[in-house]
């Protein structure tokens, strides 16, 4: 006998908003700390201002109503988008008003991009260097010029129009943020309707977004860039609306346009292969990816996401239910599997945010690697300053997101985790064997640390003793990265083997010939050797330590053998009360604090490796006699000792920033000095004792009382947690600005 299954319930999507839930009033803006009973009384001590900053955006502490918290977060997102549009508008406005974009467009290999002109106040005009084409300004390394050319922008007037459009969008975002909190605020069930959210984000944002960009690339970017590549004067190129409306004009450049949509509806899509290509490699004129490959990519991505956006069950009884998928996800050894995770992810926005930050951060680091290996925009590859800036930027952004993932995962564990709903599921099982996980991870870190540094120490010792034949190097004892070389070769051979329709490999870095643009190397095969093998294991070591610190913070955020009731103490606390020595700096917050230092450690070595490797083995000038690299291939010979890193990278390459005074790069010299100072200032907070400062403050207050000038607000030393926060902020700010000035002064001088 067959039993028909009960009819699957289909979620009926209703319009779920509350009308006018919160009146619009500016009065709260005049009451700092209005969200907290303690803070709204005003300051009695200087601790008040620190607590105000710490809690202003901690919506959890303002109310326990999940619906109101969700609305505040939703509204704040619109505010964030508004700020982003204003920033973007400012970038386009600078391109329109203060830049040499049109001159750069006419000669991108000789003229450098500039979109900032310094006003003379007391001699600052020295910063306006000669960037070519008779323009004086600061050389920029953001990549906007290359992006604008790829988009098909041919005049500064178009940049003006786009800048105004950005401000209009910003206004729309700010309005939406106000409207969806004060006028029509979504109910909690709207925020928790994950199937509808997935469908709309996948099909709308990613699917239609990619489709719109593919359409722009096909109808506007491709024809304009084809004409620019052929040397047509930007002023002679047809305007975008002409290209969109005049099919004959397009058919001259791409003959398949003459056939209209017939091949599309008869499924003969191959007819369009003149503008939807699969060439691989780089355009030899611009050193960027083929824009026709990019259009093809975005169209294919759009199709995939439009399909994906119809996967989840909403009003109709078909498609996936997220809860069913998660609860069906059981392995033979994992107990209840993912049961209970649906409830976590629909009621804890910290848990949701932790996963999204981990994914987005990892993606940002992947983007950093793709942007130099497969430069997406024309003339990006030969602009070495921009290449270095984009790599560094995406690596650091990724690192901050990943540490943020650790932070919010721990906040979820402390504030939102309910053990009763998580019995024997994967999360519970991970927490129950956390000792095994952390001790094994700790062993891995010790192993990697001693072995990777041990190889360097061996080399430094042998080098000092004058025994080069006993060193690990490409010329003595070789430690070749054979697996990486095999991966490179496999990808290089793909067009003949696994990807027969591609005309060339995805990236020139896999192998093949040098791509040179205007006498500079755009990209060439990257040979890996012993020095790369050594520093790779330093990367493995530092990344594993960062993960160890963050994961330990998450897994022990509610309890530990040392402090069994840690969950009651909250996310951040200095110590487990008086009389319990040795329990300081164990809060989940302190793990995030320590994780930030190791993230910075880890990624400094990544960007140093990239910077030196590219200058040594890739970037340089091309003449009839061959390639001359910036540092002449010294990476393989020098980067296998710690002394080599100190002498031939840090010391040798800092000469440009140290000697920049009196030149257009002098601001980088001052920044290098100032950022070192900011970094050193952080140590005052990190190595300090709170009692020392409290004692000092009280003697200073005594002096003020004597003179009858004592303040009404009593001064207090920073708490331990506040001191560490100020310390890590200045440590990272100082370190990042030091690296920024060091990199840019160097690469703008020699690149």
UniProtKB/Swiss-Prot annotation:
Known EC number: 1.97.1.12
Its signal peptide is none
Per UniProt, chlorophyll a binds at 684, 692
Q: How is the cofactor bound?
A: P700 is a chlorophyll a/chlorophyll a' dimer, A0 is one or more chlorophyll a, A1 is one or both phylloquinones and FX is a shared 4Fe-4S iron-sulfur center.
Q: What class of enzyme is it?
A: oxidoreductase
GO terms for CC? chloroplast thylakoid membrane; photosystem I
Q: Explain the purpose of this protein.
A: PsaA and PsaB bind P700, the primary electron donor of photosystem I (PSI), as well as the electron acceptors A0, A1 and FX. PSI is a plastocyanin/cytochrome c6-ferredoxin oxidoreductase, converting photonic excitation into a charge separation, which transfers an electron from the donor P700 chlorophyll pair to the spectroscopically characterized acceptors A0, A1, FX, FA and FB in turn. Oxidized P700 is reduced on the lumenal side of the thylakoid membrane by plastocyanin or cytochrome c6.
- Family per record: Belongs to the PsaA/PsaB family.
Name listed for the protein in its UniProt record: Photosystem I P700 chlorophyll a apoprotein A1
Lineage of source species: Eukaryota, Viridiplantae, Chlorophyta, Ulvophyceae, Oltmannsiellopsidales
- Gene assigned in the entry: psaA
